[in-house]
UniProtKB/Swiss-Prot annotation:
It comes from the Eukaryota. Keywords: ATP-binding, Brassinosteroid signaling pathway, Cell membrane, Kinase, Lipoprotein, Membrane, Myristate, Nucleotide-binding, Phosphoprotein, Serine/threonine-protein kinase, Transferase. The gene is BSK8. It comes from Arabidopsis thaliana (Mouse-ear cress). The keyword Transmembrane does not apply. Its main location: membrane. Its EC number is 2.7.11.1. Changing residue 213 to D: Constitutive phosphorylation-mimic mutant. This is Serine/threonine-protein kinase BSK8. It catalyses: L-seryl-[protein] + ATP = O-phospho-L-seryl-[protein] + ADP + H(+); L-threonyl-[protein] + ATP = O-phospho-L-threonyl-[protein] + ADP + H(+). ATP binds at residues 65-73, 87, 133-135, 185-186, 205. PANTHER family: SERINE/THREONINE-PROTEIN KINASE BSK5, SERINE_THREONINE-PROTEIN KINASE BSK7-RELATED. Interacts with ASK7/BIN2, BSK1, BSK5, BSK6 and BSK11. Interacts with BSL2.
Length: 487
């Protein structure tokens, strides 16, 4: 039982050797490619989203300003292992749930490979949540303004501009020409490091809220006059995005236009791009940015013409986006630890040995022996259940361990991810994969960044015959472990 090679192992081998290179450019019909592999828009329960985000845990916040942001974005994972991004609006936003649902449904009909698409929403009680595809390779702002090893390459910057222009052209063709507060934080990079436009900007932050949250120096002049966003305002914001790509800085449009008028182009261009582009290409992109930033809205180009202007400028089309951006390819398998290898093989005997040796090192201090000894009589009784479960686990009496750990969990005085992980393995040993999956998911709720929870989910999913989901969970576990124990 413990040493058989699992279907998950076979699947992982195929994914490494049999995956074809992804389409790098996607220059098909101006980026109108529909994403047909996504589920239809749906309404989620608050319980589902709480479970997916580990109770809106701080560790799962991915928005730039963390908990201080007016509308916080969390990462999460559904039961089917699909990774999601959850935008949680301020409680005073969208007081009318019907209006919120109507807007979300309209945006949720869009499906395009140039966008991080909206999968659903939740409007239970006072909550207003948007649920979208999760993009794991961060934002344009991170890669452009806060890079660590090298500045973003010219070819990648051009690819960003094209993909976002294609996304805007698609939205316009579907009757959603308004995009609120387009900026470098709205551009995300998917598993393959291809740039995508966040769907969140297609809805305002509240029913009657502002369309722009950035510094007023970057807002379209007509918005300052009227307070209304128009399709032409979106083009102006695209122009500010082009300035970001040209300069590597978030430079006010008025200052950039002064530099352009004075022909002081060197002051505008990012010095890290030296030698990567011709003067003609640089001039053409500056000219396009200037057109987008025209004071009169009617003088600005439309999205279709932006796409037409960007296509001839593309460089290094044969190089995949992950190489240009300098991030690992989604098809690349992270080197697995002994525990990861054991989970890949569904080698339950090896998993048991590793988890037994680990003990409770990964639990928070509240679950240590010292803490238990300081607690009340009820908690002392709880400790007895845990100790009996640990003894049964050590001696491989897995049915007894399940019974004792269940008593510990039912008391509910505290959450121990290790207890849930151990019980999950006990269920696997007793050929109860559904129960094992539930325990592994509960361990992740308590400790969202714990790799062992993802690994055990992978083993349980494989036992349930859900091989694709198991592969995803295994990759997630390997990624979390590599972050926890960097080389």
């Amino acid at each position: 039982m413990g040493c058989e090679v699992s279907k998950l192992s076979a699947l992982c081998c195929v994914s490494e050797s049999g995956r074809s290179n992804p389409d790098v450019t996607g220059l098909d019909e101006e980026g109108r490619g529909e994403s047909n592999d996504l589920p239809q828009f749906r309404e989620f329960s608050i319980e589902t989203i709480r479970n997916a985000t580990s109770g809106f845990a701080a560790e799962n916040i991915v928005s730039e300003h963390g908990e201080r942001a007016p509308n916080v974005v969390y990462k999460g994972k559904l039961e089917n292992q699909r990774r999601i991004a959850v935008k949680r609006f301020n409680r005073k936003s969208w007081p009318d749930s019907r209006q919120f649902l109507e807007e979300a449904k309209a945006v949720g009909q869009l499906r395009n490979h140039r966008m991080a698409n909206l999968l659903g929403c939740c409007y239970e009680d006072e909550e207003r949540l948007l649920i979208a595809e999760f993009m794991p390779n961060e934002t344009l702002a991170k890669h452009l303004f806060h890079w660590e090893s090298q500045p973003m390459k010219w070819a990648m910057r051009l690819r960003v501009a094209l993909h976002i222009a294609q996304a805007l052209e698609y939205c316009t063709s579907k009757g959603r020409a308004l995009y609120h507060d387009l900026n470098a934080y709205r551009v995300l990079f998917d598993d393959d490091a291809n740039p995508r436009l966040s769907c969140f900007g297609l809805m305002k932050n509240s029913r009657d809220g502002k369309s722009y949250s950035t510094n007023l120096a970057f807002t379209p002049p007509e918005y300052l006059r009227t307070g209304r966003v128009t399709p032409e305002s979106v083009i102006y914001s695209f122009g500010t995005l082009l300035l970001d790509l040209l300069s590597g800085k978030h430079i006010p449009p008025s200052h950039a236009l002064d530099l352009i008028r004075d022909r002081n182009i060197q002051m505008l261009m990012d010095s890290g791009l030296e030698g990567q582009f011709s003067s003609d290409d640089g001039t053409e992109l500056i000219r396009l940015a200037s057109r987008c930033l025209q004071y009169e809205p009617r003088e600005r180009p439309n999205p279709k013409s932006l796409v037409s202007a960007m296509i001839p400028l593309q460089k290094d089309l044969e190089i995949a986006s992950h190489q240009l951006l300098g991030v690992p390819n989604s098809a690349t398998t992270t080197a697995l630890s002994p525990l990861g290898e054991a989970c890949l093989r569904s080698d339950l005997t090896a998993i048991h040995e590793i988890i037994e040796k680990l003990g409770y090192k990964d639990d928070e201090g509240a679950t240590t022996e010292l803490s238990f000894q300081m607690w009340t009589d009820q908690m002392q009784d709880t400790l007895v259940f845990k100790k009996k479960g640990d003894s049964a686990f050590r001696h491989k009496d897995f049915a007894k361990a399940i019974e004792c750990y269940s008593q510990f969990i039912e008391v509910g005085t505290m959450g121990s991810p290790t207890v849930h992980a151990r019980q999950s393995l006990c269920y696997l040993m007793n050929d109860m994969p559904r129960e094992a999956l539930n325990n592994a998911m509960q361990a992740q709720v308590i400790s969202p960044a714990w790799h062992i929870a993802s690994y055990l989910q992978a083993v349980a999913l494989s036992a349930l015959g859900q091989e694709n989901e198991a592969h995803t969970a295994l990759k997630d576990g390997a990624m979390l472990e590599s972050k926890r124990n960097p080389l």
